[in-house]
């Protein structure tokens, strides 16, 4: 008995420590000097967000964004979140994931293709205080992601418009906020320009199970699977995930600010025993009145006795890129660096880079980023020209999987931590960010760095949909995303699209912004063949190389394949009524079973036909 209690206590202590470690990681991912405007609803934040359909309001943004504007009739809102998430929370619509609630024929949740964009165009609003510690400084409002377009109003002033799902926006609100008093933030959010429909395409190859509906969703730079795909609801998410889907925060700087630090590593071969580091950072002078400011940027690689500095001048309104090269600063040549390795190949060694900018000896701003020193390359020097990856010169056998976002963007750090921990435990070492999904959070990439999980990043184009009609908007979203994620050693490879082509200028832009990672035009070229199988087959077929009718799958690089798996009965009961569980209600099961494949019901039918009904 004593040993049992001792063992039980040890297990509980281990679980507690795991939860505590996860929470510490989540806290580390957030800058404590910022004000994070997370909603009370769902996220347990400190801010009361409200929402109202724009068509139900006649008042202009100048009035809605004043601190005394009445919102008693508005609904509580989830931020970060989507319009539909908030409407479901407020019980305006049923839970989409239950039974056939989301099925377009059920007519329980209006689809944007039928009711129009105005139906899901909403105002989101909250109030916040700016602390006295921000007095005399530049105050910034940072918006990390809104789908799809937005007007940003503060205290009666329209300060910015946002375009595209993956843009980070930094707004100087210094002249528009009141220190120590209530301030109002109102954001009018518009859905994607072209919502598309679930009707099959009238052009080109229809694609398996009509993925992407009529294909028009691809005219936007957004999460393409929201219109429907064969691994989720075939008829899509009703609002196309309209909303403030990522964080909003407020922070302060001095006269100048730092943004987008980047550190490049060039390793000496063949021994990988020396690293030449090149550091760069953007310095912003937001003033429109002064003639220029003399600045000094100081940097250090924390704990390594490596520091460097440079003085320069930034004129008013300038955004200046400041670079520190190892030729100019020999201390940026690191001997015997601690290399970063993927899981099961070595330790995930990480360094911290800290940069500060000062004017007249007063620190105005500081940024900190983590990085790893490693080299990831690939080639097709194999008998069948299949792509092979190398990390620090060592050949790596890829055990990968596609990473598909939760369809309604109900994300949380807790969920991200759990899913990535399970991913590592399963033996996976590479995650493909599929092109119809999203660019994941900073916390996601931080965990991939720590867990040794490589990331293959695609950029929101597929062969099942049309291509973005606004090239400049698409490229600005790519640029914003690359600047955000490029310091992560886990980021291994760029791919422009899923089974399609590239936007002209993409490889040149990636090389300009990064230049340290491989690239290919789409997911099925340059040593990577097409996917499948997408169902369970006799395991021997894999060894015999006959698993897929499309050809060889053993001696090549397969970008995607899949098979159905059944959740536990407890989870199934959260998805449907008891009466639909058994005997199987084919309509319900098919709708929840990836919809395009129906493999669970098909497999059951095949088994019954072969073996007879279960007794």
Model-assigned labels for residue ranges:
Residues 430-603, 607-610:
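Substrate-binding/catalytic cleft of secreted carbohydrate-active enzymes
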Residues 25, 80, 199-203, 412-416, ...:
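General structural signal for secondary-structure boundaries
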Residues 393, 608-615:
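C-terminal substrate/ligand-recognition segments
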Residues 109, 183, 466, 614-615:
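Short amphipathic alpha-helical segments at helix-loop
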Residues 1-11, 21-434, 439, 554:
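Secreted/periplasmic carbohydrate-active enzymes, especially glycoside hydrolases
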């Amino acid at each position: 008995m004593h040993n049992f209690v001792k063992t039980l206590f040890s297990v509980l202590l281990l679980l507690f420590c795991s939860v505590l470690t996860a929470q510490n990681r989540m806290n580390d991912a957030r800058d404590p000097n910022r004000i994070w405007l997370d909603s009370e609803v769902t996220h347990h934040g400190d801010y009361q967000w409200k929402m109202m359909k724009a068509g139900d309001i006649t008042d202009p943004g100048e009035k809605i964004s004043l601190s005394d504007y009445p919102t008693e009739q508005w609904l509580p809102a989830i931020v970060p979140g989507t319009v539909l998430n908030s409407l479901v929370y407020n019980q305006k619509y049923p839970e989409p994931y239950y039974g056939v609630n989301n099925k377009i024929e059920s007519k329980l949740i209006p689809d944007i293709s039928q009711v129009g964009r105005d139906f899901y165009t909403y105002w989101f609003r909250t109030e916040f205080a700016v602390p006295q510690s921000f007095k005399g400084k530049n105050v910034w409002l940072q918006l990390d992601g809104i789908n799809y377009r937005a007007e940003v109003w503060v205290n009666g002033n329209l300060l910015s418009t946002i375009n595209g799902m993956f843009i980070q926006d930094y707004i100087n609100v210094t002249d528009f906020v009141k220190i120590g008093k209530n301030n109002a933030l109102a954001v009018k959010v518009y859905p994607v320009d072209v919502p598309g429909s679930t009707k099959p395409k009238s052009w080109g190859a229809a694609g398996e199970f009509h993925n992407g509906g009529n294909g028009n969703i691809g005219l936007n730079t957004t999460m393409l699977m929201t219109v429907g795909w064969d691994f989720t609801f075939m008829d899509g998410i009703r609002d196309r995930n309209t909303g403030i889907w990522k964080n909003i925060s407020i922070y302060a700087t001095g006269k100048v600010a730092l943004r987008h630090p980047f550190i490049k590593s060039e390793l000496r071969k063949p021994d990988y025993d020396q690293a030449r580091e090149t550091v760069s950072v953007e310095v912003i002078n937001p003033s429109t009145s002064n003639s220029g400011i003399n600045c000094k940027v100081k940097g250090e690689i924390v704990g390594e006795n490596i520091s460097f500095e440079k003085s320069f001048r930034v004129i008013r309104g300038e955004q200046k890129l400041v670079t520190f090269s190892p030729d100019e600063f020999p201390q940026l040549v690191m001997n015997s660096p601690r290399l970063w390795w993927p899981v099961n190949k070595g330790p995930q060694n990480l360094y911290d880079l800290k940069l500060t900018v000062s004017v007249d000896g007063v620190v105005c701003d500081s940024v900190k980023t983590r990085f790893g020193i490693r080299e990831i390359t690939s080639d097709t020097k194999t008998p069948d020209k299949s792509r092979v990856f190398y990390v620090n010169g060592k050949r790596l056998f890829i055990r990968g999987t596609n990473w598909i976002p939760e369809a309604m963007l109900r994300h949380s750090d807790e969920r991200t931590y759990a899913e990535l921990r399970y991913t590592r435990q399963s033996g996976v070492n590479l995650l493909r960010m599929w092109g119809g999904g999203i660019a994941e959070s900073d916390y996601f990439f931080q965990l991939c760095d720590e867990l040794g999980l490589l990331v293959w990043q695609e950029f929101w184009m597929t062969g099942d949909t049309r291509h973005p009609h606004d090239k400049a908007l698409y490229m600005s979203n790519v640029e914003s995303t690359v600047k955000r994620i490029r310091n992560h050693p886990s980021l291994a490879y760029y791919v422009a699209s899923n089974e399609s082509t590239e936007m002209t200028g993409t490889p040149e832009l990636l090389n300009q912004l990064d230049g340290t990672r491989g690239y290919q035009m789409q997911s099925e070229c340059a040593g990577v063949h097409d996917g499948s199988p997408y169902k369970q087959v006799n395991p021997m077929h894999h060894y015999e190389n006959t698993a897929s009718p499309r050809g060889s799958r053993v001696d090549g690089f397969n970008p995607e394949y899949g098979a159905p798996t059944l959740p536990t009965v407890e989870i199934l009961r959260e998805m449907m009524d008891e009466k639909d569980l058994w005997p199987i209600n084919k309509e319900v099961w098919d709708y929840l079973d990836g919809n395009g494949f129906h493999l669970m019901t098909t497999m059951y039918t095949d088994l019954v036909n072969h073996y007879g009904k279960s007794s």
